[in-house]
Amino acid sequence: MIKARYFYLYKLIVRCRFFIAKYNTLFKQQVIEFYIQNGKNYSLISKHFQLDSRTLRHWINQFNHSRINGLAVLGKTRNYSLKFKLNVIQTVKNGQFL
């Protein structure tokens, strides 16, 4: 039941385009530079930067394919007030979807 609630919240967020980039391009670039300079161990680097190793692998693949442009954050990130975010969560809890 709890997983279903999170799934609905996720769907609502995706549908409303509430996507907020977790990592900016500069951070991704720093991680890639560290990867290139200090060896190619996904596990150690992902632990050092507290990343999921799949995320690191994805960034490296993007970098290898398109260089720095592949790391760019696509789309416009938005900042929402705490009040708005709580309102969205309350709406999901009450089952009132779009």
Curated annotation (Swiss-Prot):
Pfam families according to UniProt: HTH_28
InterPro entries tied to this protein: Homeodomain-like_sf (IPR009057), InsJ-like_HTH (IPR055247), IS150/IS1296_orfA-like (IPR052057)
Family: Belongs to the IS150/IS1296 orfA family.
PANTHER family (alphabetical): INSERTION ELEMENT IS150 PROTEIN INSJ
Protein's name according to its UniProt entry: Uncharacterized protein HI_0112
Organism, as annotated: Haemophilus influenzae (strain ATCC 51907 / DSM 11121 / KW20 / Rd)
